């Protein structure tokens, strides 16, 4: 999983895949030897990490961390363009706006195609996001009605909104440590002959990334994305 907001040959980057995580999608008909050949290329020849997913899990996660954010980011720049104070707002925009709208700067046709390909998952996430934002808007409306003093219920909802994501903040703080990879827990995976697809999917759900193979059905993984 790698990329940026740019497109075209002139935007190619030889370091794009450095340290990248690969997601290999398999199903019940995937032959282990074929999976193993691709996995070996990734960990041995590319020196990268990998996780194993099924198509459904891959598409849902891609919608969550890529496709839905592209829509949200695009909605933000649409909101600015439609605002009568857009020129002032654009002049005042700094780091927060830049970071949250970066992916909206990519080719809109590419973004549209990406979103349309995963429409059902993106729709569900956007409705979840709309519910979260509506809840916050309702809390703020209550504060306005109370002249800035939230009710006990509103205060509780406000606190919950801003602390719910704390596990992700802590996870990101850990990944910024220069020796993060060295301190990740290492686990050995014994890959069975049957049911290996589901076993490796559950490994990915625990945040384990395969970093090498010590045998045909023996892999070593690091716990790299446990939120």
Task: Please give the residue ranges for each predicted region.
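Hydrophobic transmembrane alpha-helix bundles
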Residues: 85-101, 117, 121-125, 184-205, ...
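Active-site-proximal catalytic alpha-helix in oxidoreductases
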Residues: 32-46, 57-109, 123-131
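Rossmann-fold dinucleotide-binding core
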Residues: 1-49, 53, 59-62
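Interdomain hinge/lid region at the active-site interface
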Residues: 87-170
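Glycine-rich loops and low-complexity Gly/Arg-rich segments
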Residues: 20-23, 48-49, 75-78, 128-129, ...
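Short, Lys/Arg-enriched charge-dense amphipathic segments
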Residues: 20-26, 71-84, 100-111, 172-187, ...
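Long, low-complexity C-terminal extensions of enzymes
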Residues: 131, 139-227
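Short linear motifs at secondary-structure transitions and domain/linker junctions
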Residues: 1-3, 47-52, 77, 88-91, ...
């Amino acid at each position: 999983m790698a990329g940026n907001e740019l497109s075209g040959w002139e935007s190619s980057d030889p370091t794009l895949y450095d340290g990248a995580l690969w997601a290999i999608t398999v199903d019940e008909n995937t032959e282990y030897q074929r999976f193993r050949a691709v996995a070996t290329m990734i960990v041995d020849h590319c020196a990268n990490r990998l996780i194993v997913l099924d198509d459904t899990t891959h598409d849902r996660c891609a919608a969550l961390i890529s496709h839905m954010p592209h829509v949200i980011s695009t909605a933000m720049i649409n909101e600015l363009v439609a605002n009568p104070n857009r020129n002032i707002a654009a002049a005042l925009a700094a780091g927060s706006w830049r970071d949250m709208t970066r992916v909206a700067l990519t080719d809109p046709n590419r973004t549209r195609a990406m979103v349309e390909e995963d429409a059902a998952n993106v729709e569900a996430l956007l409705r979840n996001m709309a519910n979260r934002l509506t809840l916050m808007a309702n809390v703020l409306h209550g504060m306005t009605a109370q002249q800035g003093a939230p009710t006990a219920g509103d205060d509780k909802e406000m606190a919950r909104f801003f602390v719910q994501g704390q596990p992700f903040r802590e996870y990101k703080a850990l990944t910024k440590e220069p020796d993060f990879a060295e301190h990740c827990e290492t686990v050995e995976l014994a890959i069975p002959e049957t049911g290996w697809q589901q076993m490796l999917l559950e490994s990915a759900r625990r945040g384990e990334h395969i970093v090498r193979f010590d045998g045909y059905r023996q892999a070593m993984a690091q716990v790299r994305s446990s939120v």
